[in-house]
Amino acid sequence: MILVTCDDGIESPGLRAAVRAVLPLGDVIVSAPCEQQTGAGRSLPTFNDGAIHEVEYEVDGHRVPAYAIHGSPAQAVLYALVELVPYRPVLCVSGINFGANVGSGVTASGTVGAALEAADQGVPAMAVSLETDKKYHYNHSEEVDFSAATHFTRCLAARMLVRQMPADVDLLKVEVPCDATPHTPWRVTRLSRQRYFRALPTGRRSLAEKRRLDYEMVIDHATLEPDSDIQALLVERVVAVTPLSLDLTSRVALEELEAQLR
């Protein structure tokens, strides 16, 4: 069984594209937030009531068991694993997200957060995002073409089902350019240390005025790592496949750091 989720919510065309990608690979179950949860990261908020609603879900003539969760993307995964699936899934696919998730800000991504939660529960996982214009980041536009992202989701999911990942690879983060085709090359990258999404001042006239943070996307080409996800996706225009680990420990020599701190 393959579990599919998406932080953009149960109505997202990207979620439907992910389901379409993995339908030929095995039984599929969908568990996704009932509403848009972009930026939720791996959060497990206590204010969500956890209600679960079974929904009618059909993709290409196939009826798929699907559930809308009053919760975050990570909670949608947890509810699926403890209450909805009859046995442990062999794979969790989170996506396909509207907009790239690259650089140092990926911990804020609900797409990545859901995949991290699945991985922490022992389920191999992948988080898939499609680069889109900023205007599509928070909506369910049917204008966005997910066909190439669907292709790469299917190809990489198929590989994950038959090939065991190395011990330190808990999930794959897949970034697909907006102009990709099934013939676009892909390569394995590292996570850039650059902050791609940068917050902007709200322009509020008083602190009490209600304003949401806006953001811009910025690349510092002078310091951009040549083997990074940002370089591959946004400069070279290839699909970036980044192995991520649940182990967030710094790669510094621990003995040296301890000596420095004492």
Annotate each predicted stretch with a short phrase.
Residues 2, 18-83, 87-88:
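A cross-family phosphate/adenosyl-ligand binding-site feature
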Residues 8-13, 206-208:
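Short acidic, Gly/Ser-rich segments with clustered Asp/Glu that frequently serve as metal-coordination loops
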Residues 29-31, 67, 93, 124-128, ...:
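Hydrophobic/aromatic beta-strand patches that form the interior of the parallel beta-sheet core
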Residues 80-86, 113-124:
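Alpha-helix C-terminal capping segments
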Residues 90-99:
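Short acidic, glycine-rich surface-loop motifs adjacent to enzyme active sites
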Residues 100-109:
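Glycine/threonine-rich flexible loop motifs
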Residues 119-141:
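Glycine-rich phosphate/pyrophosphate-binding loops
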Residues 144-262:
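Electrostatically charged, flexible surface regions
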